Amino acid sequence: MAKLQKGTIVTVIAALMFVILGSAAPKAAAASGFYVNGGKLYDSTGKPFYMRGINHGHSWFKNDLNTAIPAIAKTGANTVRIVLSNGTQYTKDDLNSVKNIINVVNANKMIAVLEVHDATGKDDYNSLDAAVNYWISIKEALIGKEDRVIVNIANEWYGTWNGSAWADGYKKAIPKLRDAGIKNTLIVDAAGWGQYPQSIVDYGQSVFAADSQKNTVFSIHMYEYAGKDAATVKSNMENVLNKGLALIIGEFGGYHTNGDVDEYAIMKYGQEKGVGWLAWSWYGNSSGLNYLDLATGPNGSLTSYGNTVVNDTYGIKNTSQKAGIF
């Protein structure tokens, strides 16, 4: 072996350190929070994370936070999806209130999925952009919480069943969030009020590619169209998963306006296929939709539907596992 000069040795050592540290850097960054890899969501400890949880209409019932969140936690839920408002449709949830929500959810050992509800069903980009601007305005609550807070950019933005226009919107929205320094895992709801999964199948990969962090999960809301029967549930899940994309069912019920929903199939296939799900919603649905209430009040007893979601063979109590940070 040829003798190495001192300068050469230093150069070699420096090169080796660069290789070692450089290869470790992406892994360390990913481990600071939730991340997507190979079409699956992982928590900051490197464990696959399957959401088993409940939606809570916080923005409409702001005073119930300290009652509702502990009650939801008692079901065994590992995640709670929180309705927030940017002030365009409902009463705004400001920075300090969001910080408090995160603290309460965290104290109850659940992951907080935060969503802006004001853009629901709207097709104009301004509504989506308003949601993005809201997240940027409260980013102090999000940055540093990547291991316990996930951002669902806008609830059911793009009501029309048009995948191309839906994708165009998110391909602008996601880079804007990332450029602002928000690195949390993002969730994007399907077009068609969340019930048009073909939008994800056709355009989800291009939306995912627009994320510099490659840390986006897609969400189907399964009601009377996307979740009407077992065959539909199964194919809708498989069609997205076959594209190599991470998927959750961000909302579902047991029934909806125009027909039945197979909540049993959603939970069963969610377990079999590793798809997270979040049932809609804890309580407080309007008259005529109160069959969607899981409980009779913020600390109320479970309804029949709630009992199914919590206690069924494939329900929360039998399938939920807490995130590794807890």
Regions inferred by a protein language model and the residue ranges of each:
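Sec-dependent N-terminal signal peptides of Gram-positive bacterial secreted proteins and lipoproteins
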Residues: 3-27
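Aromatic-lined substrate-binding rim segments of carbohydrate-active enzymes
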Residues: 64-121, 128-136, 171, 175-180, ...
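Mature, Sec-exported extracytoplasmic domains of Gram-positive
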Residues: 30-50, 54, 78-80, 93-97, ...
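Short beta-strands and strand-loop turn motifs
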Residues: 51, 81-85, 113-117, 152-153, ...
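N-terminal carbohydrate-binding accessory modules
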Residues: 26-79, 308-315, 322-325
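Membrane-insertive, amphipathic helical modules of secreted toxins and fusogens
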Residues: 2-5, 10, 71-73, 79
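Extracellular glycoside hydrolase catalytic/binding regions
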Residues: 33-34, 62, 132-136, 140-150, ...
